[in-house]
Design a protein with these regions (language model features):
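A generic structural signal for short coil/turn motifs at secondary-structure boundaries
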Residues: 26-28, 61, 82-84
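Hydrophobic beta-strand anchors of alpha/beta hydrolase catalytic cores
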Residues: 17-19, 49, 72
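Local sequence-structure signature of Cys/Sec-based thiol-disulfide redox active-site neighborhoods
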Residues: 2-41
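Structural micro-motif
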Residues: 15, 64-76
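Thiol-based oxidoreductase modules, predominantly thioredoxin-like and allied folds used
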Residues: 1-2, 21-23, 40, 44-59
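CheY-like receiver
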Residues: 8-9, 60-63, 96
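Short, glycine/charged-enriched secondary-structure capping and boundary segments
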Residues: 32-35, 64-67, 87-89
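Non-catalytic, surface beta->alpha helical segment in thiol-disulfide oxidoreductase systems
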Residues: 73-107
Length: 107
């Protein structure tokens, strides 16, 4: 049996992590990837975007209780601060992320 070693994800404490649970459909993956490219360009180092493929990491999908794909989960210092199921448009996604990040920094 082959052992696969994974490198830990090391993220500075001030950086939030956006977990994006991607669907199997290639068409939807392309749409999600384009959306995430724009989000990454807008938010830069404020958010680290990590795609989670349900086929490759089913245990991660289960651990977060994801029922619908795509799903977006925003984490700050290991705590979930926001979740969205389905595909939002860019303006809505940016507004929601920005609001949650601002709220999280005011704790």
């Amino acid at each position: 049996m082959e052992t696969i070693l994974f490198q830990p994800l090391i993220v500075p404490a001030k950086t939030a992590v956006l977990l994006v649970f991607v669907p199997d459909s290639l068409t939807q993956q392309i749409v999600v990837n384009r959306l995430l490219e724009r989000v990454g360009a807008e938010l830069g180092d404020v958010v680290r975007i990590t795609r989670v493929d349900q086929v490759v990491h089913p245990e991660v999908v289960r651990s977060f209780g994801v029922q619908q794909l795509p799903s977006f989960i925003l984490l700050r210092q290991g705590a979930e601060i926001w979740r969205h199921n389905g595909l939002p448009d860019l303006a809505d996604l940016m507004r929601l992320l920005t609001e949650r990040l601002q709220e999280a920094t005011n704790w």
